[in-house]
């Protein structure tokens, strides 16, 4: 299985998890010239921009580097501008390891 297919499977799994947690999925794989946002979801009137990372033999969170956060932040700014979003938002990470999901909210504050 190639990495693109694994990524799509992880995002599908993440969407199921997020819906079960009360999120409404607004968009998937939003592409901007600055980068890609895996999932954009809404919960409690807050827009969540979610980066999905998965892995079995390592800690997937370590793939979210300062450079990646910078690219995501630019893509989020572009999305907010083009969609005229003025409500609260945050950048989250959804980590999938060994079939378990962990949502880490506001990763830019870590």
Swiss-Prot record:
One of its GO terms (molecular function) is nucleic acid binding. InterPro entries: Restrct_endonuc-II-like, tRNA_endonuc-like_dom_sf, UPF0102_YraN-like. SUPFAM superfamilies: Restriction endonuclease-like. It comes from the Bacteria. NCBIfam families: PRK12497.2-4 (NF009152). HAMAP family: UPF0102. Belongs to the UPF0102 family. This is UPF0102 protein HH_1751. It comes from Helicobacter hepaticus (strain ATCC 51449 / 3B1). The lineage of its organism: Bacteria, Pseudomonadati, Campylobacterota, Epsilonproteobacteria, Campylobacterales.
